[in-house]
Amino acid sequence: MTSFREFAETCQAIEKISSTIDTTSRVADLLKKVDVEELPIATHFIMSEVFPAWSGEQLGIGTSLLYVSLSKASGMPVKSIESLIRTTGDIGDTALLILKEKRKNQVTFSSFFEEQPELSITEVYNRFKIASEASGKGSQDIKIKNLQFLFTSSTPREAKYISRLALEELRIGVGEGVVRDAIAKAFSVPVDVVEHAFMVTNDLGIVAATAKDGGVEALESLGIEINRPIKMMLSQISPDIVADIKEMKEAAIEWKFDGARVQVHKAGDSVMLFSRKLENVTNSLPDLVEIIRKHVKAESAILDGEAVAVDENGRPRAFQEILKRFRRKYDVEEKALGIPIQLNLFDIMYLNGKTLIDLPLIERRKALESCVESSVEDSKSISVDKQVITGDLDLIEKIYKEALDAGHEGVMVKNPNSFYSPGKRGKNWLKKKPLMETLDLVVVGAEWGFGRRANLLGSYTVACYDPKTLRFLQVGKVGTGLTDDQLKELTEILSGLMEGGEAGGIFAIRPKIVLEIAFEEIQKSPNYDSGFALRFPRFIRIRDDKDPEEADTIQRIGKVYSQQLKRL
């Protein structure tokens, strides 16, 4: 078994490295040392994950529970731990200091001759697993007991990274790109083979173990599996849709719906539904399960679509209405009657045992239409999104206006010859919407309001994402556009994500919540670490369907800024 000490030493070394190439080499060195059985664990750990995202497993450990566990392991009162965190700003550094002090005070003559058994990577994983599965009465005690065991069994350096892992934030800047390249380097396989294996498995842990065990041939044999969701292909806003269509010569035009992405997995009568964030939402949408059983005529299939909440006339309801269905855990049938859903399917990635992502869109479209049956009446609940392949700009404008008149967001403009690229955003899928510019940004700070908002978090520091450094870079503060109910909801959510101390009245917030923000323009600014600031930002909605890493990037901020200059 691989010791957790080895993992912690790698993390510590990476923290001191600024070069991506050197970081990749250190990760590759670690992967080479780890036993093949433990590689999935180590691979996810180094990316600040305990479980693969597709699994739906949640660790369920918050800062309060972590403080109690650390208190029990060290003897330091929780309030003292909270005070120390306000100084260090980091749970990992706090755990390191506390356990260093404890070890110093525990040194005795006999302790010099006692050898503490080493924690293994597997032992750490197993303790996290037990904690994650605890539920009901006594579950908090079980979580605390297992965390306490890890802290008392670890060295101070190991405790630093155990505590960060418990919050799934190692803060060492290692993401999927680095690990992909590290797997290629460690096991001497081409990067493009690793990339494709990741696309079809959505699990770099599986990819790493397969690469070590069987090399290129084994990696090339990996494929999509039912009930293991893959990342969804993404679209980007086109700055010049006319030029993009002319470049394609002909484009596949589809309506763009203001709903929630759904990935459908069907095997016989078994149906599972996954959200954009790859959460299993099957139990929340029983009506959709029955619709799919009835109308998808395939023994096995994985489909991509958009679920839209509709009114009695079949027109789309507000985006937040569909999210109410996705979140629902109780009174599901009652909510289904109150908020009916229409499923609009537009792609297929797998059909009857065959992976289709490497086929062009026009071929995938034929496969999709062949396995979905719905009459005009049925189309109120399920349909294949209408598609027109054309280069006629007047016709495209007509379809665009029809989509808006029907209450939808606009149109998708797709390259008919493009493959399905899981998790990728690029020029093969473009969206055209009305001109009001919005950005999806992550909350990284919040401050208490005044007057009527005195007991509410009323202003939020928002940030874009830098995929190169894996950091969130601030672009401004937003406090307008929110209703009282939205303020209460965000206060409840963000209060549980506060970390570190208060600086200038602003509390640091763990980057978990994505907001859609409208703005008048982007300006250059030295006040934020992104180098940019939003002018007149305004809250539009919470994007529960997006992970923080799906927020708009610093590169997109720069591109929007450059486009503004061209319009002057």
Curated annotation (Swiss-Prot):
ATP binds at E254, R261, R276, E306, F346, R425, K431. DNA ligase that seals nicks in double-stranded DNA during DNA replication, DNA recombination and DNA repair. This is DNA ligase 2. Pfam families: DNA_ligase_A_C, DNA_ligase_A_M, DNA_ligase_A_N. It is an enzyme of class 6 (ligase). Its cofactor is Mg(2+). The gene is lig2. NCBIfam families: dnl1. Its EC number is 6.5.1.1. The active site is at K256 (n6-amp-lysine intermediate). Belongs to the ATP-dependent DNA ligase family. InterPro entries: ATP-dep_DNA_ligase, DNA_ligae_ATP-dep_bac/arc, DNA_ligase_ATP-dep, DNA_ligase_ATP-dep_C, DNA_ligase_ATP-dep_cent, DNA_ligase_ATP-dep_CS, DNA_ligase_ATP-dep_N, DNA_ligase_N_sf. One of its GO terms (biological process) is lagging strand elongation. It catalyses: ATP + (deoxyribonucleotide)n-3'-hydroxyl + 5'-phospho-(deoxyribonucleotide)m = (deoxyribonucleotide)n+m + AMP + diphosphate.
